[in-house]
Amino acid sequence: MVQKRNHFLPYSLPLIGKEEIQEVTETLESGWLSKGPKVQQFEKEFAAFVGAKHAVAVNSCTAALFLALKAKGIGPGDEVITSPLTFSSTANTIIHTGATPVFADIDENTLNIDPVKLEAAVTPRTKAVVPVHFGGQSCDMDAILAVAQNHGLFVLEDAAHAVYTTYKQRMIGSIGDATAFSFYATKNLATGEGGMLTTDDEELADKIRVLSLHGMSKAAWNRYSSNGSWYYEVESPGYKMNMFDLQAALGLHQLKRLDDMQKRREEIAGRYQTAFQQIPGLITPFVHDDGRHAWHLYVLQVDEKKAGVTRSEMITALKDEYNIGTSVHFIPVHIHPYYQKQFGYKEADFPNAMNYYKRTLSLPLYPSMSDDDVDDVIEAVRDIVKGAD
């Protein structure tokens, strides 16, 4: 049996270097802590990175999704289709506009929304689709865009997991009508909290920018800079969802080191793939050959009959016997109590999402993991399955 680690290996950790710390320190010393020049610089550099014309920095991916839907006028009486395999915030943003979330089941291989089931879910009330690039694997955007074009739907990509993902040589963030990114602490690019909305639609970007800061026509940076004016106008009853400079200071240097961080993620995922594909009863992530996987998550599925162990037993053993942390992504949205009570969803409505959920766990995957850490995870999983024989 593999020995238990002396120190707990968490499921995820951000990689923060001296450059980020120095940038944050300089920002603190500048006296500009709220939305200001760092945010504008981060927006410009992130837009260039993904190949979009516009980027609007906000305080979360959730905010980016919500503001984009609001800016498009989506509200009561409308329906928005998304995947049941996502964090609840994706569906919650739809509800907060007054619209109704409608789910279309996932493809059992890619774990992304199935375009055929998406087409079947469209009704005369459907106004938008929110495809979720699960784990860092891109959705079938050609098929999704075809459905959207046929029905006149707004395509808002949930790319919370997809910083660095590509689809057919195009960076996610430059394909749909708009794309929402997350910079939460566990994400591939981390600012603690934070998000970004990218789009080529200038009018949409302007509306989101105004909505994100109280509906004011002039941002705080413009008002308080040496070239600004005290005067502002409120164009709509907006929200307080903007990013601030301390977050952007982190983001600027996270963006600079993203290539190196992604390379390490790919190395770790590659080792996992090689090791776990040789173990009966383990189902490794599917990887498209027409794009780049961001490897935000490494989700391992456990076939109980072949592996001789359940997903839950593996999670418990990794923690208690080997001192290794895991997580589960995600509990399908439609089985949460609120959604079942409010919309009448049943567990059996989306069998592919449920089948995946019942046998999945997310293993540690982050750039600061050492080779020894990776060895420990591989050997522990191998040991657990072997011990079940």
Curated annotation (Swiss-Prot):
**Homology family:** Belongs to the DegT/DnrJ/EryC1 family.
Asked whether the UniProt record includes Mitochondrion among its keywords, one would answer: no
Identification of the protein by name:
Spore coat polysaccharide biosynthesis protein SpsC
Q: In which pathway does it act?
A: Spore coat biogenesis; spore coat polysaccharide biosynthesis
Keyword terms of this UniProt record: Pyridoxal phosphate
Write out the GO MF terms: pyridoxal phosphate binding; transaminase activity
Q: What is the residue range of the signal peptide feature? A: none
Q: Which domain of life is it from?
A: Bacteria
Residues recorded as bearing N6-(pyridoxal phosphate)lysine in the entry: 187
Q: Which GO terms describe its biological process?
A: polysaccharide biosynthetic process
Q: Which cofactor does it need?
A: pyridoxal 5'-phosphate
